[in-house]
């Protein structure tokens, strides 16, 4: 890994003491709440529940949220010969900037390979205004190291990946006892999900990630 090591030789005077655990990572927090309600009579029972999970990851601007809602009702009719069971569930899941595996588009690459002889506080201001183009651009003087490496904070706040998943589940079952030893029944179930994924990369992100790398055709 010598090709990935850069920076001046360290000594007591020029070592800033950068440690990813202390300077980049943060404390992850996960909260979980749930509530349920059930009621009923001899011939009718109803159940409802709701649960939520909200979490913030150990890297900046990383979050995961999930909400679950469940409803179920069972009823009996005609001297308990007919039984109806219906249920419904809804799940909403949202996540922001989940970490990729490997080095590709991964903020941890820059965080781990940052030279210990440089000042981490200097790159915490991850963008600088360019008076020529009149936009703020990524500040990362270390280069990409041939592994699409970027400023970790730029990857966190300017390479945004947001995902939302909605899932609906409905089910119903109806049965009828024709005789003590014979019954007929029918069931139906619907399971539908919809996923929306959005990816935004601001100007000055690595060109290999933004698909702006252009190769001239051969003459």
Predicted segments with their positions:
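Outer-membrane beta-barrel channels and translocator barrels
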Residues: 30, 41-42, 78-80, 177-179
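Transmembrane beta-barrel domains of bacterial outer-membrane proteins
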Residues: 41-50, 69-73
